[in-house]
Amino acid sequence: MGELNKSARQIVEAVGGAENIAAATHCVTRLRFALIDESKVDQEMLDQIDVVKGSFSTNGQFQVVIGQGTVNKVYAELVKETGIGESTKDEVKKASEKNMNPLQRAVKTLADIFIPILPAIVTAGLLMGINNILTAEGIFFSTKSIVQVYPQWADLANMINLIAGTAFTFLPALIGWSAVKRFGGNPLLGIVLGVMLVHPDLLNAWGYGAAEQSGEIPVWNLFGLEVQKVGYQGQVLPILLASYMLAKIEVFLTKRTPEGIQLLVVAPITLLLTGFASFIIIGPITFAIGNVLTSGLISVFGSFAALGGLLYGGFYSALVITGMHHTFLAVDLQLIGSKLGGTFLWPMLALSNIAQGSAALAMMFIVKDEKQKGLSLTSGISAYLGITEPAIFGVNLRYRFPFIIAMVSSGLAGMYISSQGVLASSVGVGGVPGIFSIMSQYWGAFAIGMAIVLIVPFAGTYAYARFKHK
């Protein structure tokens, strides 16, 4: 524990001293600081500390990569050393917002909404992958699936499919819970709002197109005003805007309603007003906007698939550095909920992560420092499993050329899989296990993309380092 105390003291000194720390907390792998002045950080000193695997600044926070299992111990020593008191993640986020511009605040808001629901979505993606293995034809048998050859497996596959599909079927409820909580309202009302938007009495959003063509869209007649009885399954924008409205109405009413009757007044009025607004105004408008955006994106990638894959696949790692990659989860979910039924963006995310891992692994055979060798190995494996921060910030950005070579490689792989029309039926673990989220008919093309990002970044990084050394 003496070494950890020493490391904590060194970290405090490197980030500008205790007086420069407005708040501090930690996540699974990183210390998160809200610093008063980031220009006071001594980067060179920080990089020399044994427990530090990397550092970066994003969304108004200065984050120091320590590693799972060690970070909580270092944080405990840091609290003792500085006397700042333990801060919650929310407190650090609030303190860090002072350092953000409007765009960063918007990106952070989306990240705060979608990151908490990621475990449910990723789990659903993995289970859908298992269902794909059981039901897809031509994987283990030339023209049949496992359930066709072994019918006794059919009900098991059906149960897995039901469990996997639940998160996407009730996606507005998940988003409603997280969004209302983020906007300062009661998250339970957010769940009710989300479930309301996918109520079984409503026309399923996926059947809207056919119903519109046949002229059979059911409506409510509110004193002459016809309101379509349409659900918003798989939609992101309606629940986001409705959640914001719900939270603001609830906060407004709570401040102005006597405490004794809040239970009878606040929630009923809040849900009624938000519900009417959702079905009459918010839902139809955002549904149309969402369709225009997804149709436009699909059209662009349909016409310029290779170019789109090259750019998105190549620059995704750069988005990770800025923190803007979180915004694309909403786009992925919107694409999955569209007529396309899948996302062409998420497969490139998985390949980008693998590329950064391959470049980091190559550095293990290049660097002389034993600490960096160990970090290159562990961070490379971590990136293969979908966690790229140690590889990007601890290894690749430190030497620059591995990061650039990985970007070029993932751009090439993205160009290839986009030209092949590869789609993921869900989002999952963004690394090697990501293949299970890919629609089975595209496994071959995705495997070639994986081969590119496994081989090219490793070989390119190794060759460049040797050539540069000579």
UniProtKB/Swiss-Prot annotation:
Please verify whether the record's keywords include Metal-binding.
Answer: no
Per UniProt, residues of the PTS EIIB type-1 domain are: 1-88
Main site of residence?
membrane
What causes induction of this gene? Answer: Induced by trehalose-6-phosphate. Repressed by TreR.
Q: How does it sit in the membrane?
A: Multi-pass membrane protein
Q: Name one GO molecular function term.
A: protein-phosphocysteine-trehalose phosphotransferase system transporter activity
The Gene Ontology biological process terms listed for this entry are:
phosphoenolpyruvate-dependent sugar phosphotransferase system; trehalose transport
Describe the reaction catalysed, as an equation. Answer: alpha,alpha-trehalose(out) + N(pros)-phospho-L-histidyl-[protein] = alpha,alpha-trehalose 6-phosphate(in) + L-histidyl-[protein]
- Entry superkingdom: Bacteria
> Per UniProt, which keywords does this protein have?
Cell membrane, Kinase, Membrane, Phosphoprotein, Phosphotransferase system, Sugar transport, Transferase, Transmembrane, Transmembrane helix, Transport
Q: Where is the PTS EIIC type-1 domain?
A: 108-470
Q: Which InterPro entries match?
A: Glu_permease_IIB, PTrfase_EIIB_Cys, PTS_EIIC, PTS_EIIC_1, PTS_IIB_1, PTS_IIBC_treh, PTS_maltose/Glc_sub_IIC, PTS_Sugar-Specific_Components
Q: Which GO terms describe its cellular component?
A: plasma membrane
Residues of the active site: C27
Checking Gene3D superfamilies in the record gives:
Glucose permease domain IIB
- Under which EC number(s) is this enzyme classified? 2.7.1.201
Q: Where are the transmembrane segments?
A: 110-130, 160-180, 183-203, 234-254, 263-283, 301-321, 326-346, 347-367, 403-423, 443-463
Phosphocysteine-modified residues are: C27
Q: List locations, semicolon-separated.
A: Cell membrane
The note filed under miscellaneous reads:
B.subtilis does not possess a trehalose-specific phosphotransferase enzyme IIA component, however it seems that it use the glucose-specific phosphotransferase enzyme IIA component to delivers trehalose-6-phosphate into the cell.
Provide the function of this protein: The phosphoenolpyruvate-dependent sugar phosphotransferase system (sugar PTS), a major carbohydrate active transport system, catalyzes the phosphorylation of incoming sugar substrates concomitantly with their translocation across the cell membrane. This system is involved in trehalose transport.
Know anything about its domains from the record? Answer: The PTS EIIB type-1 domain is phosphorylated by phospho-EIIA-Glc (EIII-Glc) on a cysteinyl residue. Then, it transfers the phosphoryl group to the sugar substrate concomitantly with the sugar uptake processed by the PTS EIIC type-1 domain. The EIIC domain type-1 forms the PTS system translocation channel and contains the specific substrate-binding site.
Q: What is this protein called?
A: PTS system trehalose-specific EIIBC component
Q: Which organism is it from?
A: Bacillus subtilis (strain 168)
